[in-house]
Amino acid sequence: MEYEAERAEFRQAFEAAGIGRRVKRGDCWWPVRLGRSYYNAMDRLVVEVFRTEDLDIEHNFEYGKPVCFFSQTDGAVQLLPWTATVSYAEDERMVIVLPNEGVLSQLGSIERLGVGLGFDESTYRLMFQALDAVMTAREGRLAHLRDICHGGVRAQRSAAPAVPVSLPWLNAAQQEAVREVLRARDVMVVHGPPGTGKTTTLVEAVCEVLRREPQVMVCAQSNTAVDWISSQLADRGIGVLRIGNPTRVTESMLAHTYEHRFSAHPDYPALWSIRRNIRQLYSTPRKSRSRDFHQKVARLRERADELELRIRHSLFDNARVIASTLAGAAHPLLGGQHYHTLFIDEAAQALEAASWIAIQKADRVVFAGDHRQLPPTVKSRAAQTGGLAESL
């Protein structure tokens, strides 16, 4: 219901605003000219798009944003029934990742083509997948955590920590909360009204857990919340690796993003050189290519893949905290990753379905937040009535 409500709201707003108004806001290019299409270094099909009018208007397109193509016939706007993603955007040119080869011919058949910022369905898709996994789980940690969170099974606690915890800079309630986090085998909730030091307590809990575990995951519903708790941990000297779209990360956390760390890695210049060689090979006219062209490209790609994997493993091996939004926990970089402990900050503002995206990757989860503060944002009244506004 919420998905359909948001999708309908976007479509109505897109059509009601009119193309001219959206162009002036920088949310739309119309008309556009298609440039070349090719497979990029990540082996994704992309197409170049050039705007031909209103070149002086500053636009809002940037890396990672979803976009939708449309046509206009007799004043009526027709949205194409699929979304694409911005790979690169400059003043008059944009490179867009397409979902498949079939849509390319569809774009070429439209006379007056336009492109605008689109409705981001990716988070809903991830939530649907997470809910399906949770509901169908019959055994294992996911099924166990589901049964605990929904009251079917009691959460278990360990005995007192083997190493006594003394944190004199915390008050008695905060110290006890940290101890309870260490004792929790399955689920723990750290809650309290504003001003009680939840963030301070959570930071200390993460630090204490890291004395016992090599790595933890820290998530929140919003990028702002993730960056806040991550910055507090980074200030303590803890190695944080921030996963997510760098354009949505606060300036203070940019140096901790995967992309920044990747490009700063000692092996990156060698990888960049190999990728440049691949691009140069592809820039050679087809008639001038040598017989072993494909073998050369294959060898270079194999070396590039090996280097990229080595850099990735190095970054993850050296990080103590992996930080992302709840939806960001499904990032391809985190595929196959699993953590003993997951911390979810501002948990009262998190949609339950979004929480399960991250919980799938953990053996136990620590929720932190205040259930008396703002609930998750839900636009559909029917969805609110159905319980979507209730967080875990």
Give residue ranges: language-model regions.
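The Walker A (P-loop) glycine that initiates the GxxxxGKT/S ATP-binding motif of P-loop NTPases
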Residues: 192, 245, 346
